[in-house]
Swiss-Prot record:
Protein species of origin: Arabidopsis thaliana (Mouse-ear cress)
Protein name: Protein TIC110, chloroplastic
One of the GO BP terms on file: chloroplast organization
Lipid bilayer topology: Multi-pass membrane protein
Subunit (UniProt): Part of the Tic complex. Interacts with HSP70, HSP93 and TIC40. Interacts with the Toc complex components TOC33, TOC75 and TOC159. Interacts with LTD.
Protein purpose: Involved in protein precursor import into chloroplasts. Forms a voltage-dependent cation-selective channel at the inner envelope of chloroplasts, which specifically responds to a transit peptide. Associates with both the precursor and mature forms of the preprotein.
Length: 1016
């Protein structure tokens, strides 16, 4: 404890004025012991010799304390206190009575003797009695102070005040006949308690030991001090610490006082338990927040628990864990923090071994047995981890310290996350040692898994290390088996290899990869001179059988290794160009193709990749050409390269003569014959298949096995073929000065090159025919659209089109199809225009359908629906009063190919809107005295009513409705009776009125029609 704080606490507790430095943050509180402290200052100093005849049950009080550091020196008795100290309560009571009686008697006797009067004697008795009473009062008033001094001196005699018992304190109180609640006695108890608490708390630079709470609680119970009084002493200590903190000017001193205060808060919280929340008002008195109190409790609890953990080593047992759990609960440490601290402690224990192992592993002067030392340290780690794992599954694990379980170096403030490479070295060392015997035991496999978790390695990282080390061990054992002949002598080599993998816990697929790698290395050694001899083939076969390598793996290895050599030869041959592919180059190709023992398919696949790469370069340059002629020239170079280089190289690879013509596929020949019969009129297509004389003149044809079919999209291949076809058809265009140009026609040999181009591009016969037909149709269509500009097909135009067809060479069916499409398109445009302009009705539509004109394709659905709506509108405005449901709902929608339900909705909407309009129109015509128009409008009203039956209609002037009915019923020709009755119902006219209107003369109509303009 800070010495200055001890000095301050050793001073008597008195209500001294507050320091100005503390008053601004400490609230004004009434001092708890002001009265008793005032009494302590009114002690009298009276010299009385100490009697040596004290009773045997009296507690002796020495003049010098044995332990002045805590409670100071013994206090001396002054004034009446030595006399009071000698008296027991009965003696003190008797003495008080004697003194009082003697005083009264003495006063009475003196007054009577001196004055001779009884009144004066009574007065003297009263005065003497008062004096005696004062003596008695002083004597009794000194008792609590004497008891307090006796208690102080008694406690000061002990070297360890904790030895004081509750019985000792009660004996002192009983001896003097005082109550423990007496202010002076209670003040002394509080002072003793305050001094003891101060002495128990750690001094400057020290930490809590963990026994402070037990000592304070024991001493508090021994003194019998009340909880509120004890809490007040803790608050007083806190005030003094705060005061000293304000008086301290140094930063270090301030920090130390802050730590001292946090220790006080923590110890106080444990001493008073749950009652500390209201017994210790830190926030109200010292402005300390609840969060700061929680931090003080948490940090000190962590410090104490950490100190307890230091006592636990790697030989931890059940008793240690139970004690740690009890300590955690007594320290008020949360389970989460306790778990973190325990894991950190176990991590530190393991780190010692890990660090030792790393230092050995990285030592430059490490001995040959360094690996064994490293493994020994790691075994200690695993042993400690297994101990914790077993304790975690203990039957009484719920009573153990929190955090018992497997260890991991990763987490919290550990720096091993940045030293992952070092941990990998340790793991590798352990795996290497586990496989040092040539096999991997089950217990080692489990230990490797645990070590991986402890070191915090990822599953992939650990697996990579294990596979690497196991692969080396597998290679070593495999080499021994091969060199010793054990593997070759086995009847079942697969079982032997499988057993080897099981002993090492090695994956069979990874073992197969090692076998493949060994085979590849052997193969590379055999082909160093560019070919495989018979001895090499035999050695490779022997190795393949011993290692059980599948044929597919062997073929893949040969294709890659031998193929790489062959590919280089092919590239050199191709790079020599058209002129450089001589006999020497052909010889090297033949040697590589057959000496490397490549299959024909593999060799052709390798050559195909290289050739197609060159073809692609030609195609790229052809696309980048400025015009069609330059593009065709690049394509011609590609055709020449295919004929002079690729064709020869393919023959060399196959071992055939290049002069031998390739065999034609009979199915393909049949397809070409069928196409010749169908499209023989196409001159451009016919020229691509020349006669024998021209074929012999052009020389041997090019190969068609290596094509660009899978390298270019269909659209690009067709465009390239079409480009060269147009070049063959139009010829070469040469520009001359003054803006003129000369077109040079090409001979039929260009069409043979076109045929070879089709083979290089991988176009089928059908695709080639479609290209030729498409160009012919395009040429014919362009000319035919000019001839049929107005869509009219006359006899002269037919003859003109026939002549054009012969020139183009387009077959008759195709020509007729083009002509029909042109005329149909022209007609569709004309029909659509007529519909939009309203010049086409349903009658004309039916005539067109009878003429086999497809209206569905010529007229859009929206236009057909528009035409239907116009037709229905004409019916509702025709003035006939007729509405044929079959015609409107079925026949017309069928003729126009529209939806029937949708047609019905259109009819209903029109009928409902035209119903009221027809009535308004009829009234308007009535006012204009247009009787004929009135009849027509009423017929339209009846037609709408037939489509959608209506309710009786209302009108403001009922006489006008009567006039409408009268005019309609008397119209000429006379309407049908059912129409008259329906109109009567719609106009809301009763039978009597209807009869009167029919019998009324024409001139007797109401004048409502004449006045209608004003009414309206």
């Amino acid at each position: 404890m800070n010495p200055s704080l001890v000095t301050a606490i050793n001073a008597p507790i008195s209500p001294s004025p507050r320091s100005p430095l503390l008053s601004h943050f400490l609230p004004t509180l009434p001092h708890r012991f002001s009265k008793s402290e005032c009494l302590s200052r009114r002690r009298y100093r009276v010299s009385f010799p100490r009697s040596s005849a004290a009773s045997s049950d009296q507690l002796s009080v020495s003049t010098q304390a044995k332990n002045p550091g805590i409670h100071g020196n013994k206090k001396e008795l002054t004034g009446l206190q030595p006399i009071v100290e000698k008296m027991t309560p009965p003696v003190r009571l008797a003495t008080s009575a004697v003194v009082l009686a003697a005083s009264l008697a003495t006063g009475y006797g003196l007054g009577l003797r001196l004055a001779g009067s009884r009144n004066i004697a009574f007065g003297g008795a009263a005065v003497a009695g008062a004096a005696g009473g004062a003596v008695v009062y002083a004597l009794n008033s000194a008792v609590p102070e004497v008891a307090a001094i006796s208690l102080h001196n008694y406690v000061a005699e002990f070297e360890d005040p904790a030895s004081v018992t509750k019985d000792d304190v009660e004996k002192i109180a009983d001896r003097y006949g005082v109550n423990k609640g007496d202010e002076a006695f209670q003040a002394e108890i509080c002072d003793i308690y305050c001094r003891y608490v101060t002495s128990v708390l750690p001094t400057e630079g020290q930490s809590l030991k963990g026994d402070e709470v037990a000592k304070i609680v024991k001493f508090k119970n021994a003194l019998g001090i009340d909880e509120p009084d004890a809490a007040a002493m803790h608050m007083e200590i806190g005030r003094r610490i705060f005061r000293q903190r304000l008086e301290t000017g140094e930063r270090e001193g301030d920090a130390e006082q802050r730590r001292a205060f946090m220790r006080l808060v923590y110890v106080s919280a444990l001493v008073f338990g749950d009652a500390s929340s209201f017994l210790l008002p830190w926030k109200r008195v010292l402005k300390v927040t609840d969060a700061q109190v929680e931090i003080a409790i948490r940090e000190n609890a962590k410090q104490l628990y950490a100190e307890r953990l230091k006592l636990v080593g790697r030989d931890i047992n059940v008793e240690n864990l139970v004690d740690l759990r009890k300590s955690q609960l007594s320290f008020k440490l949360s389970d989460e923090l306790a778990e973190d601290l325990f894991r950190e402690h176990t991590r530190k224990v393991v780190v010692e071994n890990i660090s030792s192992a790393l230092s050995i592993l990285k030592s430059r002067t490490r001995a040959a047995k360094s690996l064994a030392s490293v493994v020994e340290e790691l075994e200690k780690v695993l042993e400690f981890n297994n101990l914790l794992v077993s304790l975690k599954s203990h039957s009484e694990a719920d009573q153990f310290a929190r955090g018992v379980g497997p260890i991991s170096l990763i987490g919290d403030e550990s720096d091993f996350e940045r030293r992952m490479d070092d941990l990998k070295l340790l793991y590798r060392a352990y795996v290497t040692d586990a496989l040092s015997g040539g096999r991997l035991e089950e217990n080692k496999l489990v230990a490797m898994s645990q070590l991986r978790n402890i070191l915090g390695l990822g599953k992939r990282e650990a697996e990579a290390i294990s596979v690497d080390v196991t692969s080396k061990s597998y290679r070593k054992r495999l080499a021994n088996a091969v060199s010793s002949g054990d593997l070759e002598a086995q009847d079942s080599k697969a079982k032997y290899l499988q057993k080897l993998c099981e002993e090492l816990h090695f994956d069979a697929q990874k073992a197969g990869a090692i076998h493949e790698e060994i085979y590849r290395q052997k193969l590379q050694q055999c082909v160093t001179d560019g070919e495989l001899s018979d001895d090499n083939v035999a050695a490779l076969l022997r190795l393949r059988v011993m290692l059980c390598i599948p044929q597919q793996t062997v073929d893949t290895a040969h294709a890659e290794i031998c193929g790489t050599i062959f590919e280089k030869v092919v590239r050199d041959a191709i790079s020599s160009g058209v002129d450089g592919y001589d006999a020497e180059t052909r010889k090297s190709v033949r040697k590589a193709a057959h000496g490397l023992r490549l299959s024909r398919e593999t060799a052709m696949s390798i050559a195909s990749k290289a050739v197609r790469r060159v073809f692609t370069n030609y195609i790229r340059r052809a696309r980048a050409a400025e015009n069609r002629t330059d593009s065709a020239k690049e394509l011609k170079k590609m055709i020449a390269f295919n004929t002079l280089v690729v064709t020869e190289m393919v023959a060399d690879i196959k071992g055939e003569s290049s002069d031998k013509a390739p065999e034609e596929d009979p199915v393909q020949e049949k397809e070409e014959d069928d196409e010749d019969e169908e499209w023989g009129s196409l001159e451009s297509l016919r020229k691509t298949r020349p006669d024998k004389e021209l074929a012999e003149k052009m020389g041997k044809p090019g190969q068609t096995e290596i094509t660009l079919k899978d390298d270019l999209p269909d659209r690009d291949r067709i465009d390239l073929y079409k480009t060269y076809l147009l070049y063959c058809v139009t010829g070469e265009v040469t520009r001359i000065p003054f803006g003129a140009q000369i077109t040079t026609k090409r001979d039929d040999s260009e069409y043979l090159l076109l045929n070879q181009l089709g083979g290089i591009l991988g176009l089928s016969s059908k695709e080639i025919v479609n290209i030729h037909v498409g160009l012919a149709e395009q040429a014919f269509r362009q000319q035919a659209e000019v001839i049929l500009a107005d869509g009219q097909l006359t006899k002269a135009r037919v003859e003109q089109l026939d002549e054009l067809q012969k020139q183009v060479g387009l077959p008759q069916p195709q020509a007729e199809k083009v002509i029909k499409n042109i005329t149909t398109t022209k007609m569709a445009n004309a029909i659509e225009t007529a519909v939009n302009q309203g010049r086409l009705n349903i009658k004309q539509i039916r005539e067109l359908k009878e003429a086999n004109v497809s209206l569905d394709s010529m007229i859009a659905v929206s236009l057909r629906e528009k035409l239907f709506k116009k037709t229905v509108s004409d019916i509702f405005s025709s003035g006939t009063g007729e509405f044929d449901e079959t015609e409107v709902y079925q026949t017309i929608p069928s003729d126009l190919s529209i939806d029937v339900e949708k047609a019905k909705r259109v009819v209903h909407d029109l009928a409902q809107s035209r119903l009221s309009n027809s009535l308004v129109q009829a009234v308007a015509l009535l006012r204009q005295r247009n009787s004929k128009g009135v009849v027509l409008s009423l017929n339209d009203l009846l037609a709408c009513d037939k489509a959608v039956p209506a309710e009786p209609m209302s009108w403001e002037v009922s006489e006008e409705l009567s006039d409408l009915y009268a005019i309609y019923s008397k119209s000429d020709p006379k309407p049908a009776p059912e129409k008259v009755l329906r109109l009567q119902y719609l106009l809301g006219i009763d039978d009597s009125t209807a009869t009167a209107l029919r019998e009324m003369e024409d001139g007797a109509l109401s004048s409502a029609a004449e006045e209608g303009n004003f009414v309206f």
